[in-house]
Structures are given as structure tokens and as C-alpha cells.
Curated annotation (Swiss-Prot):
Its EC number is 6.1.1.12. This is Aspartate--tRNA ligase. GO terms for biological process: aspartyl-tRNA aminoacylation. Residues 198-201 are annotated as: Aspartate. It is found in: Cytoplasm. NCBIfam families: aspS_bact (TIGR00459), PRK00476.1 (NF001750). Belongs to the class-II aminoacyl-tRNA synthetase family. Type 1 subfamily. Coiled coil: none annotated. It catalyses: tRNA(Asp) + L-aspartate + ATP = L-aspartyl-tRNA(Asp) + AMP + diphosphate. It comes from the Bacteria. Pfam families: GAD (PF02938), tRNA-synt_2 (PF00152), tRNA_anti-codon (PF01336). Homodimer. GO terms for cellular component: cytoplasm.
């Protein structure tokens, strides 16, 4: 037995008890006649004492050779600690060591294994196994485990069954790029790694497994944006014989359960917002509703004056920012430069200061009088001491720019409190979106999403107006889950493929197995998938998902610890009948 207790459980009730501990040397303090060592494991830190007058001489001298991160086993007696440490659970005691074995030595770590480390992100990624020893990373992984356990418990109590689906599947060109896997046994043919278990969970519904879930790895070979991973984890769920309301209620319940059990927070019924309302009011389909700054459209009061910029714009839209009416011209100019960056893309910005005396001062006073500006303030909800920022241009583009500004200002003003949780449902998404590059419609979610029955007649005449039986759960400005009611009959699915530009042959080749299954009594069904990595990070109060993943990739999709991806041997390529063309 390497240990009788862990390094986080001993206290004053164990005084005079003989114990065995094992762990890593955090640090040591040599006072000549006495030596203290902090021993660390996953559970905490226990102080060891080596006393020249009470410890075996060999053990005492051996303690002087210990370096950081040495792995040791000690035996000794629990004694009361003279200088108590209230910051750790074992701070009332220490161990008078009688025996010690060095289980393994260690090189000096390339960064300090402390809560606040001197290691940059790159070096910590390279030595991730050392980074995991640090409390922030370790605690993040333990928190992820708790979330996963609560999910499994909640869904299992509702008779959901966890079923594993295949990782080696068929490639489908629709959507993001697949990671492909060559098949040695089937020359010239390839598997794909799943972007989601979508079709398999639908087939499970056809198979009668009416409540399915899975915590599953998914893969997308796409250009990585900040804080994205090529492999990610979903809480994937599907149910048969349900309508949209059933799914919203169950998974709202799951989220409320997680908030209560893990954060001690009771949340009221989630508000619901249509996609169109979210886009018009917040400029995106995942609004952060922890704070206000809702959009006010100013076309009625800003156009048809003498200001050519607004007159030429499709949309003039603004937000009122609380408490920044005293911003200096330098601060305002810096914000204008911020929105003009390529990442945002605005051509400029108009501002209006709402003075305490009820008057207004703007950058366009030449064109608009106090009455006009009063209408702007009323439309945006601006009060004395606030400032109104106005953007103009093409409607969709301008809303996106103002949304970026809204989020940036909220961050600067401390309005995005990570300890506050504001969930909502966004519903009634468009079924289709038009892609200018390809010149055809694409499914906004995926090709298996059911249109709202009352909009079916619009598919031929006005496809962009067809709404989907689709829904997203949004938490603090992040989409943490999304799903839909699925198409469950062959004819409707064939019609959907047609509107998405598939030929009959293409549809049959890619999804014939699903179409065939629909001919054998497919039940009405629908589902949802949560992004576990993002959900855990938000519940854990962090901006980045990386610390909640044991071995993440960097922003280039590389694992710098194991140096992957890597070149494979020519013999392997030959065996797979693959010839590289890297010109």
C-alpha cells in the first residue's frame, strides 16, 4: 500500500496516528537542524517535518536531496503543527517522518507548479502533464467531471439510455470539412470522423430507443478561430414521440439542475426570443442578456435630413451606453478607431452625449437639432449621463458591427459578470440561408431539420421566409446547445434535399441509408446537443475552454506535446495506396 491517506484529508483528529503518504514535492525549506517539505497530490498539501533530533539520520540526510516534483513515499506520525496554516485543509497538523522512499526523481520543471505560474501558454501546452498538476487546471478537469456526472444522473433518471455510435462513418460534403481516415482493407476508400452523431441518433429513434444520449467526441476540419478545437465534446440527445415544447422543457430542466447543483443558483423559467427579434434587438442570434444596451433603429428620425451618410444607408441603428457621458474626445476617437478595424469593418461612428441638464451634444449637431436627438435618446432608452453610439450602412452588416461594439463596451464596463447566469431560448430560426458564393440555399442547421408545417407552402415561392422547428439555448452570449424537430418521412426529406440543390443521385448516395430507414415506421423525433467544453467553461466562470480539456490543441490545430499531426512513413502510405502531392 503506497498510502493510507491522501494529502488533503488529515487534520487534528488524526494526531498521534501513524500514516503513510505519497505524492510530489512541492517545495522544501531547510533550516539546518530541521527540514520541512510540502507534499502534494491531487487532494491537497500536507507538510512533512524532518527533525535532526527525532528523525532517523539516514532519512534526515535523504530529505536534503529532494528536489521539486520528486515523487516520494513517507511514513510517520501526525503531530500538531506549531505555526498553523488556515489556507489549507491540513494546516493544523504536520507529519513527523520516520521512513522515506524516493519513488522517482524529477528534472527541474520548465515552469513553476503553482497556482500563479511563470510559464507561458506555449510551454505549458508542451508540458501539459506538468500543467495538469497545477490547481487551476486540475480543478477545471474535476469540475468537468462533476458536470458530466450530473448530466448522466439527470438524464438517466428520466429513462434516457446512453448509447455509443460509430467514430468511423461515411463522409458527407455538406457543412464543415470532415477529417478523413483511409481504409487499408478497402483500397481507395475513406472513412470520416463524425462532426456529430446526427444520422445515427435518428436511426436509433427508428430502432425504438426513444430516449438516447451520449457524451461524445466530434471532429471538424475547419479553420480554427479563437478558442476552438478540431475535436470537441457534445452532450448529444434525441427523443422520439416529442414536440418542440417537450424538448425545451426537458433540457431547460437539465440546465437548471446543473446551475443549482454545481453553482447553488436557482433560475426562473428561461425567456424565449425569436431569431428575428434577437437579430433586430442585439445584432446576433446568441444575445448576452445580462445587460441592456438594446438596439434602437433610427431610420425614422435620422434619414431624410441633410446628413448624406445616413441618407445613403439602408439602416441607421444605435445603442445607449450607460454612464459614459463623460468620455473624453480621446476616448471616443479610440472607440471610433476600434469599430473601423478590419475585424469590425465600420466606416465611422456618430456619438451623442446625453448631458445632465437634459441637452445633447453630438458629432452631427450641424445636421440634427435637439428635438431630433431627443428622439434618438427615447428610441435607445438613453438617460442623462449616457452616450449614444450610432452606426449606419447595409442592415445585416451594420447590426453585426454594432453587436461587436455592444459586447466590447460591456466587457470594458464590467457588465459581463461571470458569476451571473442569464440563459434563454432562441427559436423560430430560418430553415434556409442563401450562400452568395455557391448561389444556392444551405440548411441553417442541417438538412434533417423539419420546417414549421404552416410555412411549408413557402418553400417554392419564398424559401428564405420558411421557419424551422429549431431552437438554440444561449447562456451569457454563448450558444451552448442547439437542436430541432427532425424530418421523419422520406418524401419530405427528399423534398428538402431538392431545395438544398442535391440531385436525387447525390441524396441517395450520401443519405440513402436514412431515407430507406424512414420507410420502416420512423417515429416523430427531435433532439438537441450541448457543447460540453463551452458549457463547462461558462459554468466554471472562465472565458477559455482550453483548461477544461485535458490535452487540447493549439490555435493551429497542433498538439505540441506529442507533435501531432506528423509525417507518416512511406511504407504506411504505400500500404494505404496514397501518394502525396505537396506542390
Amino acid at each position: 500500500m503506497y498510502r493510507s491517506h491522501n494529502c488533503g484529508e488529515l487534520n487534528a483528529t488524526h494526531i498521534n496516528k501513524e500514516v503513510t503518504l505519497a505524492g510530489w514535492v512541492q517545495k522544501s525549506r531547510d533550516k539546518g537542524f530541521m527540514n520541512w517539505v510540502d507534499l502534494r497530490d491531487r487532494y491537497g498539501i500536507t507538510q512533512l517535518m524532518f527533525d535532526e533530533s527525532r528523525s532517523d539520520k539516514t532519512v534526515f540526510e535523504l530529505a536534503k536531496t529532494l528536489g521539486r516534483e520528486f515523487v516520494i513515499q513517507v511514513k510517520g506520525t501526525v503531530i500538531e503543527r506549531e505555526a498553523k496554516n488556515k489556507n489549507i485543509s491540513t494546516g493544523e497538523i504536520e507529519i513527523l517522518v520516520t521512513q522515506m522512499t524516493i519513488l522517482n526523481s524529477s528534472l527541474t520543471p520548465p515552469f513553476t507548479i503553482e497556482d500563479e505560474t511563470d510559464g507561458g501558454e506555449d510551454i505549458r501546452m508542451k508540458y501539459r502533464y506538468l500543467d495538469i498538476r497545477r490547481n487551476p487546471v486540475k480543478n477545471s478537469l474535476l469540475f468537468r467531471h462533476k458536470v458530466a456526472m450530473e448530466v448522466r444522473k439527470y438524464l438517466s433518471d428520466l429513462d434516457f439510455c446512453e448509447v455509443e455510435t460509430p467514430y468511423l462513418i461515411k463522409s458527407t460534403p455538406e457543412g464543415a470539412r470532415d477529417f478523413v481516415v483511409p481504409s487499408r482493407m478497402n483500397e481507395g476508400q475513406f472513412y470520416a470522423l463524425p462532426q456529430s452523431p446526427q444520422t445515427f441518433k435518428q436511426l436509433l429513434m427508428v430502432g425504438g430507443m426513444d430516449k438516447y444520449f451520449q457524451i461524445v467526441k466530434c471532429f471538424r476540419d475547419e479553420d480554427l478561430r479563437a478558442d476552438r478545437q478540431p475535436e470537441f465534446t457534445q452532450i448529444d440527445c434525441e427523443m422520439a414521440f416529442v414536440e418542440q415544447e417537450d424538448i425545451l422543457n426537458i433540457f431547460e430542466g437539465l440546465t437548471r439542475h446543473l446551475l443549482k447543483e454545481l453553482k447553488g443558483i436557482e433560475v426562473e423559467k428561461f425567456p424565449r426570443m425569436t431569431y428575428n427579434h434577437a437579430m433586430k434587438t442585439y445584432g446576433n442570434d446568441k444575445p448576452d442578456i445580462r445587460f441592456g444596451m438594446e438596439f434602437g433603429e433610427l431610420n425614422e428620425y435620422a434619414k431624410h435630413k441633410d446628413f448624406p451618410v445616413f441618407n445613403a444607408a439602408e439602416l441607421v441603428v444605435a445603442i445607449a451606453v450607460p454612464g459614459v457621458g463623460e468620455y473624453s474626445r480621446k476616448e471616443i476617437d479610440a472607440l471610433i478607431e476600434w469599430v473601423k478595424r478590419p475585424q469590425v469593418g465600420a466606416s465611422g461612428m456618430v456619438y451623442v452625449k446625453c448631458n445632465e441638464d437634459g441637452t445633447y451634444k453630438s458629432s452631427v449637431d450641424k445636421f440634427y437639432d435637439q428635438g431630433d436627438l431627443s428622439h434618438w435618446a427615447k428610441t435607445t432608452g438613453a438617460k442623462a449621463g449616457d452616450m449614444i453610439f450610432v452606426l449606419s450602412g447595409p442592415a445585416d452588416k451594420t447590426r453585426a458591427q454594432l453587436s461587436a461594439l455592444r459586447m466590447e463596451l460591456a466587457t470594458r464596463l464590467g457588465l459581463r459578470n461571470p458569476a451571473e447566469f442569464a440563459p434563454l431560448w432562441v427559436v423560430d430560426f430560418p430553415l434556409l440561408e442563401f450562400d452568395e458564393e455557391s448561389g444556392r440555399y444551405h440548411a441553417m442547421h442541417h438538412p434533417f431539420t423539419s420546417p414549421k408545417p404552416e410555412d411549408m407552402h413557402l418553400l417554392e415561392t419564398d424559401p428564405k421566409s420558411v421557419r424551422a422547428n429549431a431552437y438554440d439555448m444561449v447562456l451569457n452570449g454563448n450558444e451552448i446547445g442547439g437542436g430541432s424537430i427532425r424530418i421523419h418521412d422520406k418524401n419530405t426529406q427528399a423534398l428538402m434535399f431538392k431545395y438544398l440543390g442535391f440531385t436525387e443521385e447525390e441524396a441517395k448516395n450520401q443519405f440513402g441509408f436514412l431515407m430507406d430507414a424512414f420507410q420502416f415506421g420512423a417515429p416523430p423525433h427531435g433532439g438537441l446537443a450541448f457543447g460540453l467544453d463551452r458549457l463547462v467553461a461558462i459554468l466554471g466562470g472562465q472565458e477559455t475552454i482550453r483548461d477544461f480539456i485535458a490535452f487540447p490543441k493549439n490555435n493551429s490545430g497542433r498538439d505540441v506535446m506529442i507533435d501531432a499531426p506528423s509525417i507518416i512513413d512511406d511504407s504506411q502510405l504505400k500500404e494505404l495506396h496514397i501518394q502525396l502531392d505537396l506542390k
